[in-house]
Amino acid sequence: MESTKKISLFIVVFLGLLTAITPLGTDLYLPALPIMPHELNTNASLIQMTIGIMTFGIAIGQLVGGPLSDSFGRKKPLIIGNILCVIASILCSVAPNIEVLLVARFLQGLTGSIGVVIAKAISRDFASGKELMRLMSLLMLVNGLAPVIAPLIGGQLLLFSTWRFIFIILAGFSAVLLIGSFIFTESLPPEKRISGGISIAFKNYGTLLKDKSFLGQSLVQLFAFGGFFAYISGSSFVYQNIFNLSAQEFSYMFGINSCGIILASVLDRKSVV
């Protein structure tokens, strides 16, 4: 049955921005990675870990954020998540050492991912069938474009600022999402909310972990994304330290590579019968 709710331009833009926060948080500061070890008196491996630990936070946040929104509605978890994401981003910008930065990056991923998973839930509140597919395709497009645009923006920011300013930009982006969360009208009425959503969700997670088919497919995804994130975390060091490219030149190379990934995804979908 098709949803009767009207999808406004605000909802479309808001959901797109919610979806963009995690790829922006991952890719915006990539051009700055090689200059960060010296400033924080640490090594490249620990700086690269700031990407991995944020990704871990994203994974945990999505496991919790979805059930929370099913139990308490979409609006409250969004507001709380975006407030905490603003704080985490500011903490990243003022981190005095690598230890504080790692903690802040984990919190940034944890809180930012709440908006990502709730954006998908809101999509289902407003649409179904083909309309839902079109809306989800739009959100996937945002997810695809963000890795192309983010390093380009980050590289240009480094022309007149430091890597710390990049996290201020992320804090500002989260603040915009926070304002949108206050404007957003709750899409899940109380009568449709699930009591004990978190406990039910974790029981379902336990069932999934016993499913061999699920585990097998998850391992395939794990290895695929493991290689992808190895490239993300190491590419800026290789391009800038070995090939002597500037931060801006690296961002162009990374953007071209991301375009290739998007093209491959499109061709892959068209090849499926």
Model-predicted regions and their roles:
Residues 104-145:
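Cytoplasmic helix-loop-helix junction between adjacent transmembrane helices
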Residues 182-206:
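Flexible cytoplasmic inter-helical loops of multi-pass small-molecule transporters
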Residues 60-99:
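Conserved MFS/SLC helix-loop-helix module at the cytosolic interface between two early adjacent transmembrane helices
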Residues 27, 55-63, 147-148, 258-266:
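Residue-level signature of mid-helix packing/kink "hotspots" within the transmembrane helices
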Residues 270-273:
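Conserved small/polar residues in nucleotide/adenosyl-binding loops
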Residues 41, 73, 94-100, 111, ...:
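Helix-breaking motifs and short loop linkers at transmembrane-helix boundaries and internal kinks
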Residues 10-44, 65, 231-236:
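Extracytoplasmic
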Residues 96, 100, 129, 135-182, ...:
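Helix-loop-helix hairpin linking two adjacent transmembrane segments in secondary transporters
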